[in-house]
């Protein structure tokens, strides 16, 4: 069951283009930091990192573009995949009562776990950044251990 669309979308030429696109988007995401000067050394995490208090508007944009939009896209894609997994058996045998196969459920569960891990790993840092951007004085009241833990 190998789709012709897959061969067309993921040809060697297109795959190289996708890799170049990912790197170009990465550079595009980093460049604004140079102009806003938002990369600074933070002694709490012993690293040069994104300073959330430099520009509230910029921090909000970073959280939206780098966290909220990807979460929305991934949620939409996973829902579409799951709906397709549920609908395919009904299309093949419309009069029968299809059951979800164990491997289909396992695949969905794996995708869901990956999504949850992405959200769990990135949410604390992004929500702290969003809170600091909306209420800059809140930055001093965030416990150091919470801020440090959000990086790991």
Swiss-Prot record:
SUPFAM superfamilies with a match to the protein in the record: Family A G protein-coupled receptor-like
GO molecular function: melatonin receptor activity
Gene Ontology biological process terms from the UniProt entry: rhythmic process
Stimuli inducing this protein: By cocaine, which increases the levels of day-time expression.
Location relative to the cell: Cell membrane
Keyword check for Transmembrane: yes
Residue intervals passing through the bilayer: 14-34, 59-79, 112-132, 145-152
PANTHER family: B2 BRADYKININ RECEPTOR/ANGIOTENSIN II RECEPTOR (PTHR24228), MELATONIN RECEPTOR TYPE 1A-LIKE (PTHR24228:SF49)
Homology family: Belongs to the G-protein coupled receptor 1 family.
Name of the protein this chain belongs to: Melatonin receptor type 1A-like
Species of origin: Danio rerio
Origin organism lineage: Eukaryota, Metazoa, Chordata, Craniata, Vertebrata
Gene expressing this chain: mtnr1al
């Amino acid at each position: 069951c190998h789709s012709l669309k897959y061969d067309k979308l993921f040809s060697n030429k297109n795959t190289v283009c996708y890799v170049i696109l990912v790197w170009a988007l990465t550079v595009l995401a980093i460049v604004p930091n140079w102009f806003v000067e938002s990369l600074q050394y933070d002694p709490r995490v012993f690293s040069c990192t994104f300073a959330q208090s430099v520009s509230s508007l910029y921090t909000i944009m970073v959280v939206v573009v780098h966290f909220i939009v990807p979460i929305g896209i991934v949620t939409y894609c996973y829902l579409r995949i799951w709906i397709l997994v549920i609908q395919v058996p009904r299309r093949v045998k419309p009069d029968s009562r299809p059951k979800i196969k164990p491997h289909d459920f396992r695949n969905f569960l794996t995708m869901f776990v990956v999504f949850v891990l992405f959200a769990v790993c990135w949410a604390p840092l992004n929500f702290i950044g969003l809170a600091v951007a909306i209420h800059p004085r809140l930055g001093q009241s965030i416990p150091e251990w919470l801020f440090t833990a959000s990086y790991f």
